[in-house]
Every structure is written in C-alpha cells, then in structure tokens.
C-alpha cells in the first residue's frame, strides 16, 4: 500500500466520509464494530451523511461491511471491490436518487477561513471530494483553507479607484478601500477586513510600523497587491512623520513665487506661519488639513 493509499484509508476510518449513527454520532470504525451492517443492508437501513452529496469515491482499502453500505448508497463506476475481505452474497436493494454531477470547483467567499469539515458541510461534498477538487478559487487577500494547500484559479482581479484622496506609497492595484474616520485605529481596520498589520503596511507603505500616522478622510487599501508602485516614503514627508501626508490627488491650488525671494502670505492662513516662504498650498475638504487655511510647502 502506498503512502497516499494509506492516508486515504486513514481518513476513511476517522473522518466524516462513511456513514453516521445520528443517535450516537459514531463513524466508520465504530460503525464496523457496533452495527450489523449485513442486516441493515437487507432492511434497507444503511445510511450516508445527510449533509453530503453521494459522489464518486475511492473505496480502496475499505472493509467489506463499509463497501456494502456504499454500494447501496452510491453508483460507483467501475463497481470493483478492492478489499481483501470475502464477498458476502446477498441481494442489495436498488439505490434511490443519486447525485451524479459532483462539483469540480468551488469558490470561497472573501475573508473566509474554513476547515475541511466545515467546507464539507457548507458545500455539501465529502471531505474526500474536497481533496479531489480541480480548483479552489480564493479571492485576493483571503486566508487559505486550514490544513490544505489549494491550487488557486487564474482569475483576473478587478481593481477599483480610491473613493477619496490617497497618500504616496499606496498601491494602485487595490480591490477594496477603507476611508479613515476620526477614532479609527489599525486594530479596528484589521478586525473589520481580516487583514494583518504587515499586509496593511505593504499596501500602504506610507504607514509606519506602529500605525501611528493614518489620517481621517484619506483612503487606504485593505485588499490588493503590493507592487512597485508602492513607495517606502514621500518626497516631502517621511514615513515616520506625525504630520498629515501630502496627498497624491487633490483639486487644491498652489501659489508659487515667480521670481526669487518670498511672496506675500495669502489669507486666510493659520497662526505660526514661517517667514521666507516661496510656495503655498490651499487646503481643501478631504485633505486632512485645516479647511480654508494656507499651509507652507517650501520655505527658504
């Protein structure tokens, strides 16, 4: 027996692939030792898990009692008995309606993590069927199925535009955005979208390691691809700055000196403005700055 066959046999014995005694919740080995399978088959009382479809199944290594029960419940092609036990010559009743079209691919919804047993119930397929699926399609940013290493489908991600202003260092290949509100923290964002801090920073590289520089009214990517378009810093403010970042997109206007020297500070302006400024920026709604106040961009 190969290792693969042995593991299949082990799962046959201990997982939810055989038949269940609903009153005692017994499976497989308990079934073989405590049930009189022969009489159950004759009385048409043999069972199959109620939440799974009766799909094709590899019966190699299963004992004769389980094989008889499976022959009653499913139409196995080719109908060969691979067990070493002696055949029991009994008349088996014709099986009832059988699901012959079994799923070849399933899609796990976004931000979902499932065990194999949970998936068997959710998608109505035996756990053995999950191992034989051709494709398990997982959306970008979704955790893999526990205990498996599925093959993801080659789907094309749909990127969406940011709903509001972003900062330098935010990926352009984003599938979902979060606009920060006053009081938001990275912990709240992580919990809402099922994203780790490391992934969040990879998508929004302006954010520092303590996540202490996210700003209200700015959009941050929470599901997407960290690409070369993401930058580790901005040209004006470093990633460790505690001041609001310079936005990537805005409709605000710049006031720039046309000759060397300074220009008159436009009004209104916030207090504490430095002298010797050559360029001013007029803040607009959504910038995360004081509305209708000019700020310094460059100074001598």
Curated annotation (Swiss-Prot):
Disruption phenotype: Leads to enhanced fungal virulence, with faster decaying on infected fruits. Keywords: Chitin-binding, Virulence. GO terms for molecular function: chitin binding. Residues 176-222 form the LysM domain. In plants, chitin acts as a microbe-associated molecular pattern (MAMP) that is recognized by lysin motif (LysM)-containing plant cell surface-localized pattern recognition receptors (PRRs) that activate a plethora of downstream immune responses. The LysM (lysin motif) domains are small globular domains involved in binding chitin in eukaryotes. LysM1 contains one LysM domain. Belongs to the secreted LysM effector family. Non-secreted LysM effector that might be involved in manipulation of host defenses for successful infection. PANTHER family: AM15, PEPTIDOGLYCAN-BINDING LYSIN DOMAIN. This is Non-secreted LysM effector LysM16. It comes from Penicillium expansum.
């Amino acid at each position: 027996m190969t290792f693969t066959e042995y593991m299949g046999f082990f799962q046959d014995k201990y997982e939810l692939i055989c038949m269940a005694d609903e009153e005692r919740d017994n499976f497989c080995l308990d079934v073989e030792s405590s049930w009189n399978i022969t009489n159950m088959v004759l009385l048409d009382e043999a069972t199959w898990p109620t939440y799974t479809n009766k799909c094709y199944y590899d019966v190699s290594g299963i004992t004769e009692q389980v094989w008889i029960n499976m022959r009653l419940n499913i139409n196995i092609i080719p109908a060969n008995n691979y067990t070493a036990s002696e055949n029991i010559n009994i008349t088996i009743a014709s099986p009832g309606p059988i699901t012959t079209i079994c799923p070849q691919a399933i899609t796990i919804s976004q931000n979902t993590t499932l065990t194999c047993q949970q998936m068997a119930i959710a998608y109505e397929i035996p756990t053995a069927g999950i191992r034989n699926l051709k494709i398990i399609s997982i959306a970008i940013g979704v955790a893999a199925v526990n205990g498996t290493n599925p093959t993801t489908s080659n789907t094309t991600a749909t990127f969406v535009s940011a709903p509001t202003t972003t900062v330098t260092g935010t990926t352009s290949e984003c599938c979902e955005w979060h606009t920060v509100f006053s009081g938001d923290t990275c912990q709240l964002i992580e919990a809402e979208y099922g994203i780790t801090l490391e992934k969040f920073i990879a998508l929004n590289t302006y954010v520092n390691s303590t996540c202490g520089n996210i700003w209200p009214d700015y959009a941050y990517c929470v599901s997407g691809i960290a690409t070369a378009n993401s930058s580790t810093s901005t040209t004006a403010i470093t990633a460790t700055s505690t001041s609001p970042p310079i936005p990537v997109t805005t409709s605000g206007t710049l006031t720039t000196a046309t000759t060397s020297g300074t220009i008159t500070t436009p009004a209104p302006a916030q207090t504490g403005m430095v002298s010797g400024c050559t360029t001013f920026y007029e803040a607009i709604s959504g910038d995360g700055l004081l509305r209708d106040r000019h700020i310094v961009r460059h100074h001598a």
